């Protein structure tokens, strides 16, 4: 036994010496990328470390100070998804986003060039209303109502924007799990939010990705009960607006609904005071009404208003 150990030690020593001197082998340095750029040898940026509690606190510190905002954004809606093999973008849409805690949101989109109203949608966190000017169509229903239109843009929901634009910290029903996802091409933390499934098992409800170079939030993925992706949102150009940090570029993709929206913030006013009427969307006279049933029921067909 002692002889075997001595032999193993000698072999290990020889192997280490061989590799240390290259032993005639071809040695290649692997390129390390950070933000898509090669790292210069000896100048590797320092990676920041944090616990799951500290990362959740960062989310809280971003979320809590914002009670409202009014933003002007350049919006690029897109139809399709990577799962469908095709994505078509609609360029140069200007939009105005109004938000008030806890869940009031209104988004008014303007057509390219002429800047007439393309759509107007509002939600109080429970129900939503959407007016599509090109079709003179007024849609209303629960936030949880299914996407039923063959026109993906008619399936826009204000709540989908809100859940992506404002990143919530962990709720009382969520458990946190932290993973270090650092390799040659990226340096990230992945913070998983777990909820209890119907049979008591842990189910991932969302994942938030942090850049380890500065611990900024780079991405948020929200999952359905089966693990499918409801939304995949990427964040960039974090900017301070009125002493509050907010991403100036937000790229929302909703593969199950078949659409996405990229937004670039042009102007932002934080913690603005709104009146209730600012979140009131009245049905235009002569528009067709489509009511999407509650609890997943089918949408009622569009109908004209009574005379």
What kind of region is each of these model predictions?
Residues 24-25, 33, 176-293:
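Gly/Pro-enriched, hydrophobic low-complexity segments
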Residues 1-21:
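Sec-dependent bacterial lipoprotein signal peptides
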Residues 75-119:
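Post-signal peptide N-terminal segment of secreted/secretory-pathway proteins
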Residues 57-59, 94-99, 121, 233-240:
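Extended lipid/amphipathic-ligand handling interfaces
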Residues 25-28, 101-160:
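An acidic-aromatic
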Residues 50-53, 132-206, 283:
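Flexible, processing/modification-adjacent segments and terminal tails
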Residues 59, 71, 107-108, 128, ...:
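Buried hydrophobic packing residues in well-ordered domains
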Residues 23-92, 294-307:
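N-terminal leader/targeting segments and the immediate start of mature chains
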């Amino acid at each position: 036994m002692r002889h075997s150990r001595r032999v193993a030690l000698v072999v290990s020593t020889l192997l280490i010496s061989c590799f240390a001197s290259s032993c005639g082998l071809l040695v290649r340095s692997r390129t390390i990328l950070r933000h898509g750029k090669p790292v210069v040898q000896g100048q590797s940026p320092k990676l920041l470390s944090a616990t799951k509690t500290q990362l959740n606190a960062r989310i809280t510190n971003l979320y809590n100070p914002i009670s409202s905002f009014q933003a002007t954004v350049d919006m690029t809606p897109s139809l399709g998804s990577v799962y469908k093999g095709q994505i078509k973008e609609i360029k140069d849409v200007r939009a105005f986003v109004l938000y008030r805690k806890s869940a009031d949101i209104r988004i008014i989109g303007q057509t390219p060039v002429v800047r007439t109203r393309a759509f107007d949608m509002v939600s109080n966190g429970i129900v939503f209303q959407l007016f599509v000017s090109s079709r003179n169509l007024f849609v209303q229903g629960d936030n949880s109502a299914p996407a039923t239109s063959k026109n993906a843009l008619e399936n826009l929901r204000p709540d989908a924007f809100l859940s992506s634009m404002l990143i919530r910290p962990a709720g009382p029903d969520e458990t946190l799990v932290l993973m270090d996802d650092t390799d040659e091409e990226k340096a990230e933390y992945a913070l998983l939010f777990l909820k209890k499934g119907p049979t008591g098992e842990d189910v991932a409800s969302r994942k938030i990705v942090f850049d380890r170079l500065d611990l900024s939030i780079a991405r948020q993925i929200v999952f359905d009960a089966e693990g499918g992706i409801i939304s995949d949102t990427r964040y960039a150009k974090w900017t301070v607006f009125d002493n509050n940090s907010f991403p100036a570029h937000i790229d929302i993709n909703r593969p199950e609904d078949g659409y996405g929206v990229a937004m670039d913030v042009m102007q932002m006013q934080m913690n603005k005071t709104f009146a209730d009427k600012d979140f009131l969307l009245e049905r235009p006279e002569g528009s067709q009404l489509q009511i999407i049933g509650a609890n997943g029921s089918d949408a009622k067909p569009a109908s004209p208003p009574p005379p």
